[in-house]
């Protein structure tokens, strides 16, 4: 995939790892396939894509990698209904910091964004109304809030920000 992108458009300046499956199931009801899906969809692509884009970024001595985790993944609190997803997203944070340390000498920054509740239009309004009560800021984040965080980490203003985990949660999960 990386070589196809590079051959068609040239260089890769930034890698944003934002997609990944999510499901809510009690740990004791989790299936081997569901467990595997959480790691194969949330953690493994970040490893493989980071490994694939690193040589080109290192050669140019510049690049940005942004990985999406989840709010409170750094808390190490039991999450019985989303255990596989939670462990994979905690792994994203460890991988982010490791890549940041390895790639910093080459002018490459690697950071994480850990969103809490973001209204992307897919959640039922009644569910969002219940959630907003748990957010200290008093409102649910927007897709625009997420875009602003990504834009910042891609900018020159963030050139010294490396290995960070930017909580995008209105204070929820901290």
Indicate where each model-derived feature is located.
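Catalytic loop of short-chain dehydrogenase/reductase
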Residues: 66-91, 96-105
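Alpha-helical segment proximal to the catalytic Tyr-Lys
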Residues: 55, 101-102, 159
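A short, exposed helix-loop element centered on a Lys and neighboring polar residues
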Residues: 50-51, 97
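C-terminal substrate-recognition "lid" of short-chain dehydrogenase/reductases
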Residues: 142-168, 173
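Substrate-binding pocket helix/loop in short-chain dehydrogenase/reductase
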Residues: 12, 26-27, 34-39, 123, ...
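Short, small/polar-rich loop/turn modules that mediate ligand/substrate recognition or access, typified
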Residues: 104, 109, 161-163
């Amino acid at each position: 995939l990386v070589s196809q992108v590079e051959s068609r458009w040239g260089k890769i300046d930034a890698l944003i790892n934002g997609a990944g499956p999510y499901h809510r199931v009690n740990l004791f009801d989790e299936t081997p396939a569901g467990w595997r899906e959480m790691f194969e969809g949330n953690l493994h692509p970040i490893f493989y894509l980071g490994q694939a884009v690193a040589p080109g970024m290192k050669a140019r001595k510049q690049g940005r990698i942004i990985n999406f985790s989840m709010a409170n993944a750094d808390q190490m609190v039991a999450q019985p209904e989303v255990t596989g997803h939670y462990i994979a997203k905690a792994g994203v944070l460890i991988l982010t910091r490791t890549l940041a340390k390895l790639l910093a000498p080459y002018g490459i920054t690697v950071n994480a964004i850990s969103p809490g509740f973001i209204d992307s239009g897919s959640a039922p309004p009644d569910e969002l109304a219940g959630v907003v009560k748990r957010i200290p800021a008093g409102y649910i984040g927007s897709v625009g809030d997420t875009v602003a965080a990504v834009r910042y980490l891609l900018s020159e203003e963030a050139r010294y920000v490396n290995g960070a985990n930017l909580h995008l949660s209105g204070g929820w999960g901290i």
